[in-house]
């Protein structure tokens, strides 16, 4: 790759990383790409929500399930897993919780 293209790409990644905050950049880019390719359905996301020490993850499981209707389960004492059709706006809304350290996971084409 040319030096100019690499510089542009590095700048792009830096800007996206700043905009996404706690959201893993690869996850965010996957979701946004799928949103643009498949206009009629949100991507299927397997979201790993990593909480800070001391957070009651059982209550977080309930609140995420109640608010969004996702399949949600506690994974360990600091992690909650959520699966459902999500767009980047939903992920950014979830990331607003000050008790979250980071959001990771994967996204794929939704199935009906």
Predicted regions and their residues:
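Autoinhibitory N-terminal propeptides
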Residues: 1-112
């Amino acid at each position: 790759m040319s030096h100019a293209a690499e510089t542009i790409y590095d700048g792009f990644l830096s800007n996206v990383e700043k905009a996404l905050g706690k959201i893993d950049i690869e996850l965010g880019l996957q979701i946004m790409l799928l949103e643009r390719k498949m206009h009629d359905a949100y991507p299927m996301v397997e979201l790993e929500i990593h909480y800070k020490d001391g957070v009651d993850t059982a209550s977080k499981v309930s609140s995420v399930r109640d608010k969004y209707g996702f399949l949600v389960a506690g994974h360990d004492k600091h992690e909650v897993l959520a699966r459902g059709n999500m767009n980047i706006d939903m992920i950014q809304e979830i990331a607003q919780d000050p008790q979250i350290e980071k959001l990771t996971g994967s996204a794929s084409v939704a199935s009906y």
